[in-house]
Swiss-Prot record:
Gene3D superfamilies: P-loop containing nucleotide triphosphate hydrolases, Tetratricopeptide repeat domain, Winged helix-like DNA-binding domain superfamily/Winged helix DNA-binding domain. Residues 856-875 bind DNA. It comes from the Bacteria. GO terms for biological process: positive regulation of carbohydrate metabolic process; positive regulation of DNA-templated transcription. Monomer in solution. Oligomerizes to an active state in the presence of the positive effectors ATP and maltotriose. Pfam families: GerE, TPR_MalT. Positively regulates the transcription of the maltose regulon whose gene products are responsible for uptake and catabolism of malto-oligosaccharides. Specifically binds to the promoter region of its target genes, recognizing a short DNA motif called the MalT box. ATP binds at S39, P40, A41, G42, Y43, G44, K45, T46. Activated by ATP and maltotriose, which are both required for DNA binding. Keywords: Activator, ATP-binding, Carbohydrate metabolism, DNA-binding, Nucleotide-binding, Transcription, Transcription regulation. InterPro entries: P-loop_NTPase, Sig_transdc_resp-reg_C-effctor, TPR-like_helical_dom_sf, TPR_MalT, Tscrpt_reg_HTH_MalT, Tscrpt_reg_LuxR_C, WH-like_DNA-bd_sf. This is HTH-type transcriptional regulator MalT.
Amino acid sequence: MWIPSKLTRPGRLHNAIVRPRVLDLLQHATCYKLVLFRSPAGYGKTTMAAQWLADKPNLGWYSIDDSDNDPFRFMNYLLQAINKATHNACPNAQKLAEKRQFSSLHSLFSEVFAEMADYHGECYVVLDDYHLIHDETIHEAMRFFLKHMPDNLTLVVTSRSTPPLGTANLRVRDLMIEIGNELLAFDTEETTRFFNQRVSDGIDALTANHLRDYVEGWPSAMQLIALQAQHQHRTLAQTIESVSHFNHAHLWDYLVEEVFDLLDDETRYFLMQCSVLDHFDDALVSSLTGRDDALAMIESLNRFGLFISPLEGETNWYRFHNLFAEFLAHQRQARIPQQEQDLQRAAAKAWLEAAAPHQALRHAHLAQDTELLASILSQYGWKMFNQGELEVLEAAINQLSPPQLYREPKLCMLQAWLAQSQHRYNDVGALLAKAAKEMKALNVELSTKEQGEFNALRAQVAINQNEPEKALELAELALSQLDHTTYRSRIVATSVVGEVNHVLGHLSRALSMMQQTEKLARQYQVYHQALWALLQQSEILLAQGYVQAAYEVQDNAFKLIEEQQLHQVPLHEFLLRIRAQILWCWNRLDEAEQAAYKGLSVLENHSQSKHLHCYSMLARIAIGRGELDKAGRFIEQIQHLLKQSTYHVDWTANASLSLLLYWQVKENSTEIRQWLQSSTRPDKACNHFSQLQWRNIARAQIQLGELSEARHTLDFIQEQAQEYQLVTDTNRNLIVEALLAITEGDDLQACHKLKQALRLTNQTGMIGNFLIDGSKIGHLLEKLVHKGELGDLERHRAHLLLKEISTTQRSRSIHFDEEFVEKLVNHPNIPELVRTSPLTQREWQVLGLIYSGFSNEQIAHELDVAGTTIKTHIRNLYQKLNIANRKEAVQTAEQLLQLMGY
């Protein structure tokens, strides 16, 4: 439950004096990124900000308390404030935050900025009491927010200390207005107006100056002095004498003597009871105190001026002034310490009645009542889990004693799921093992249903640890133990059964189970699991050779992401990755590249280790285009990641394919040999990733001349592919078999394998796999076409392949990489002008791209540099080669290519 009062600015400012000297400094605040009100407690930061912004229509206010250090909670309140300031300009970002469907705070802010691009009104967002935030993740996110937020937004922060928001940098760049305690402190003129407004006898200049100097302009102290004068019917001069020894350290004593002791016992007790609550309405107070007249009491205190502020726009919601709240807490602990635990328990129960278990947990913790904590977690834990309150839940569970945790299987399960949902896969198994041991020691007997829930999660752990047989056994056992009401565990167990069958090569059963998983997940609105099931279905269909069907399932997955705002979850990258793989196979390289880059964007703030798949695809695309310089940079990234982390064979096999293709083009046999010697060799090849790994091994063996070993490898994987009906891998294997036959000098066998591959390609649409070795198989494709040995569809496909091979070869010559340029400049017939005015490597690349028909903008994008830089390169190469225009540049490039035999 979100507390509405946290999103409302303070009301009732009619007693505050107008402060033109401060307001004048804020006249041009819209020209600054940040307005910071920074001072110790009691200097009127919030009041000053509220007064300044009172007539600003586009305003969002967020009152922070110490429970807001949870990034999920903080972001939800902040986005609600932003939407209030911008008239709901960021609805999608709000939905992402509420559903916790963002990969990082940066990516969520990026969505905010994208949505705010269409909002042009001047607006303000206030973060009140930011000093209560100590979470570094939030600080870092807010620094990013300040750096990139739109110019029409001004952030206003009130804080007792300097917030770690990069204020030094903002100050140097003149992008911040800072209102410190020296400005917030009253001067003599303001002190005079302040007391004249509150004290019937007024104040003379000498007394005002004396008062101002004594309390150093501290508004709260002045308020206390005015209260003393009012209640004791003293003049201000007499009041000054009574507080001659007043200072910050003695504030509590002063408040006791001059304010608190003036109240009747009933009011004092009521205030101490209410002070347990940070925010409250009459219903909460009534539940806490048992009083039926709670609202009347609160309104009476408000009229009396006892630091209770009604919250603007919310009926009967209040909060104490921070300073007074601290004082009341001090009094409560000094005067009624024996009631502290009971009050905190009562506050917890009051918040539960208000459907706010998050607040209830905090008070149960303050009550040191772990039994109450356990009860709240047992009753509300899964609901909070589904709402994304993961950190709050984990902190509460960690406060429980072992008996409290392990006597309740539901809490053990919740603890393990918290680790699983936060991708701490290595912790989950340990937590489950410890839970089993502790429950046995406590003689806790699990019901059949509870056993099923534990086994479902154990099955997920087993599949994460690449133990498919164990995972299948546990998942099937779980399904036999679970009833239909435990939908989450049934969905997980069903998914694991499908995933295991996929890994073991039982594709038809795997597909059926994943379709069932999707249906259940959609029915119970577990959309992450539905998305996972769709991704698995796509991979299964692809393995079965139904590539178009796999593509269409991916379309459904993209639709689900749109509908449920799942754009920033890591599974979105998985979808983009497998979409890129299909597009690469169809030789739609531009689209594949876009998908891979978008995948990197989704994972922007995740561990770099997760980027391996995308870099593997980008390297493969660059190699296919002949952009070996670019490919080399991706290869370096891949090699770095492989050294830093341990990966599943699915990841390493894809990365290895890119490495081998790069080394093959670079004729680097040393690297290929080293890879082959250390390569993983799966026991079976019953799924797409073990097939790919063995196919990589065969490719390396062919490249190194180990042809008999390659034959043995290919025989093995083809036998496995046919046994498990891996149609797409059969298609790919045939192409490598043709490559082996060519290397052995057996063109007849190579043609036979190519014909089979072309026939299967009618179903799969595979083109990219042929183009990998286009230079070696091209002449045989021509022979097959000319001999008339192909059917109409196969012949059409062969013509397309020959055209693409020709284009690819041309592309590789057009992209002037280092190797090509070195051969060119050393050619005996190179024009003297080229020899005497050598181009830089980048200028050669630009010339090649001009020849390819790229515009300046496209060249800049291709080389990842600014457009102005490209113009400089073009000007330089024109001067060096005595070229007048683009047409002459194309002619010059063509002449050089012809010189090299292209």
